Amino acid sequence: LKLPNFAVIKEVGPRDGLQNEKKIVGTKDKVKWIQLLTEAGLSYVEVSSFVHPKWVPALADASDVFSELKRDPNVTYAALVPNQNGLERAFLQNVDEVNVFLSASESHNKSNINKSIKEALAVIEDITKQATFEGKKVRGYVSTVFGCPYEGDISATAVDEICNQLFSYGIYEVSLGDTIGVANPLQVEQVLEHLLKKYDASQFAMHFHNTYGMALANVVKSLEYGITTFDSSCGGLGGCPYAPGASGNVATDDLVHMLHKLGVQTNIDEEKLLRASQFIQSKLNIQLPSHVYRALQHKTISR
């Protein structure tokens, strides 16, 4: 395998991982969890979402979490921003980076944010302009890239058209999301073959869910194409409220463990990462799906 020497892991657990959990984690516990994640060496954390609390009650305390964080200057603390109101709240908390999102599928876009792709792009263009003016970098998520619960397969051309728009607005990186976890390595190859004719691998991140257990295989295929940035969630938490059947994100614990075994460095301490998983599992009172955590949790707890 010809693989890169280093990969960047963007931790999305505090936002994507917690947004669907029925049990709401308290603000102080979220702050402590984020601190454990950064102490483990994660240099990028998506802290929360400035979405209306009515839609995502689990993240209603986004402003409080940001104001209580003791920020490490070497860490990027990002937030998901759905609209103008969310952007103003994000500015008040001086977030390091603004994340915007839309779906490659019209149906999922309608279901998720009640907008057409065209309408969503107009909102994103406006947010990006304002955020850039304020000196904030903007990152874009495109969801359902590899399949939609309503429309099935999504064409690489449709994804390309959206990416083209996002890059034209000044978005520095697009995270390609397998929202319902249906991607396989062949499909990843097909999408990247298409996109990398036109764009550089450094402009993309991959965001895999593990519904069918193929997330890590998809990561390896992406690495072969020179992709070096991956979104993941501590312990494998997460799903999508508007994507029926979606399971958790690829677990940061599993991803880091595999990368290290493949000789790809991350600057993340696996043992400290397991402590972060152990902490959030105890607060949610659930069994985390991470394979590495399950295999090693007793070893971690016994120390």
Where are the regions that the model predicts?
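Catalytic cores and adjacent flexible loops of soluble metabolic enzymes
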Residues: L1-R303
